Amino acid sequence: MRIAVDAMGGDHAPKSTVLGALAAIKENPAITVVLVGDEQAIRNHLPQDIPANIEIVPAAEVILPDDEPVRAVRRKKNSSLVVAVEMAREKKVDAMISAGNTGALMTAGLLYAGRMDGIERPALCAYIPNSKGRVTLTLDVGANMDAKPHQLVQYAVMGSLYAEKVLGFERPTVGLLNVGTEEGKGNELTKAVFPLLQEADLNFVGNVEARDVMQGACDVLVCDGFVGNVLLKAVEGAASTIFSQLKQEFTSSLINKLGAAILKPGLVRFKKKMDYAEYGGAPLLGLKSPVIKAHGSSNERAMKNAIVSATRFVQQDVNEVIQQSLQKNTLGESE
């Protein structure tokens, strides 16, 4: 199996991407990681004797975080991100990963990889940790600011299959993000999609309020990209604030420091559950080729886990399963 990595994408690239690739092949020697980007910058973080299952594909350009996505993808065709997506489209690799510009990755995915038959709009996923020791797969978290009811049903089908095949959730539950749990709650979109989700071949558990997401109210949470992105940023901000305040309190006095020492094992476990690096990358579902988005701040561990996620995606043939399900349920038809 061959996985392409945009070696120049992310806040800590190329060091994090290269070291993550080395960690991934150490854990699974059967895979080959293709590092795409500035060859010399990549080599600076590789051992003198480069492992046989690490390859370098030169790419002279880099799409920066503040680049306008569509313009950057069209003008920087030799960028590490675009080259990696093209490799996936041309079947030179089985999947690609980037921690770079999210908008550019989505644009490149649409322009080069293309949408799956029947999919109108791909959806970007994210993992939100919950109190059950699992994650809630949330989509869409920013690929499309607006969505139609039948498109949310497509998100639900794709997310449910991904949760089952890659995350290992047996018959995952699906929830609709809303302002209340009652069936009649919400705006026109959520009211319209509710009965469609009930009719679909899904383990639909109804509306889910934002406050219940981290309690594990469902395995797959469906929403439009605007609402999903707001939820994701709120969760990230809350987690960051909590850890910052805990650190401040635990270091404010000798007694607090002693208490922190006693609580340290539990705090470490809690932080690990909340750490995005544990979950690696999340997919852009609905594209013909597997495209995985890693967090922009990904470190070595996060990149390694993103490669692991991509490997599972390919092994479980998720795209083919999604395509068959869409054809079976004719969910690609507009309503």
Swiss-Prot record:
Pathway: Lipid metabolism; phospholipid metabolism. It is found in: Cytoplasm. GO terms for biological process: fatty acid biosynthetic process; phospholipid biosynthetic process. Gene3D superfamilies: Isopropylmalate Dehydrogenase. Keywords: Cytoplasm, Lipid biosynthesis, Lipid metabolism, Phospholipid biosynthesis, Phospholipid metabolism, Transferase. One of its GO terms (cellular component) is cytoplasm. Its EC number is 2.3.1.274. GO terms for molecular function: phosphate:acyl-[acyl carrier protein] acyltransferase activity. InterPro entries: FA_synthesis (IPR003664), Phospholipid_synth_PlsX-like (IPR012281). Belongs to the PlsX family. Homodimer. Probably interacts with PlsY. PANTHER family: FATTY ACID/PHOSPHOLIPID SYNTHESIS PROTEIN PLSX, PHOSPHATE ACYLTRANSFERASE. Catalyzes the reversible formation of acyl-phosphate (acyl-PO(4)) from acyl-[acyl-carrier-protein] (acyl-ACP). This enzyme utilizes acyl-ACP as fatty acyl donor, but not acyl-CoA. This is Phosphate acyltransferase. It comes from Brevibacillus brevis (strain 47 / JCM 6285 / NBRC 100599). The lineage of its organism: Bacteria, Bacillati, Bacillota, Bacilli, Bacillales.
